[in-house]
Amino acid sequence: MDTPTLLAHLQTHDTPLTLPRGGTLRWDDADLHRAAHAAGPEHYALLALAPGALPWQRARVLLQTLAASQAGLDDATRDTLARLARVLTLALPPAHVITVLLALRRLRANHKHTTRTVLRFVLEHPDADALIAARRPALLDCFEHALGKTAARGCARRIDDGDTASDYLRRRLLRFLAVPAAAPARVQALYAAPPAATTGGLTGTGTAAGTGTAPGTATGPVRALPDEPALTLDPAREQPPTVTATNRGDIAATLVHLYRGGPAEDLYAALGRYVDDAARAYPRFAGTVALVLDASASMRGYGEREWAVLSQAAALRMLLSRVCDRLEVVEVGGDERAPRGATDLATGVLDALAAGPDLVAVVSDGYENRFPGDLARVAATLPRAGVTTPVVFCHALFTAADDLTLRRPAPSLPQRGFWHQDDFTTLLPWMFAHCPAGRPWLRAALHDRLDVLDRQAADLTTALAA
């Protein structure tokens, strides 16, 4: 499966995984995930970290990664998958992760990497005590599936007898953990009698002796399951109550002030800092991007919206100039400082292709008012003419709610909208995913993100040890 299609699926398909009692796992896109994993386990798994991927899709990636064998994978790939699984178990809502772990039990998937991930979630999650209190039966099932019922109960008996570091515990349990000292108390909590059953001790079934409680069934008060992830993958975006030309990101806001005649020296200095800060978040793209930049009169806008759309398009151009080894800009109509005239996007695309780029990106508000339909005809003709260079359409919007009914000049082209500087975090991976030169960039960007998240996960583990 091609990367853009998989990315779009991860960012739009929001159907939950469900596990009916006594039924089979309901996973409506399992074939798609299995095919993507088979094509490249590391690339597939890293895409779960792509900005904008949905929680239930990330849960599916976690499930597929843990369910699949790692036979034949090199050590570096195994390490990447292990770190990613650890990050996802902390960055997903706990209920999602518990569903994944129970699904692994239902699928009878139990590899060493699966065991390690399950045990570290059950015993080392920062909210493990609250999770066990709320979902003890489910987590007990996960624990016994990971170790095997006999080994799990053998460990529990030894811990109940005061053993914390015997060879038996090290070989069967503690070697899988990063903070072994936290395990005994939580194993005891897993096998503790339900709150309403206070007599008797631990039995071989994980129930309280002398009670009629079934294994894994709580009869005490229901505890609330923590619903917030311990690790944040995508920071929540604060939407302004009213969108204006100057609250759509620092780069665009500074450009608007410049276009309106503000103090140039101070504004240019600030602009450079803002672009540098934004570019620092991305690796270099070792290829050529040809940017068809719509600088027609409609991009300027009017009234309170004046310069809003063009400034955001210019912000994208400035960011790409810092990220790409080579950026060719083809302006259509006028130029950034003096937008004018009509929109001839088709000619702009043909001129851009003449530069021999790896990718052509059209940035426009979508109003094609010179030879309407030309861009669609050119887009349809290029493959027949043997042109294989990917062309994508980046919709410059005023807000995310813009009506694009009359603003799709080439419906066959891949399209994505952007209105705020924060949208660049999803726009750039989407753009570069369409060309072969973008695959190494995407891998580097996602590896960088994994490194940052893995350090944050390690900090959580360190806090647990303290």
Predicted regions and their residues:
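Long lumenal/extracellular ectodomains of secretory and single-pass membrane proteins
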Residues: 1-206, 210-290, 295-302, 330-466
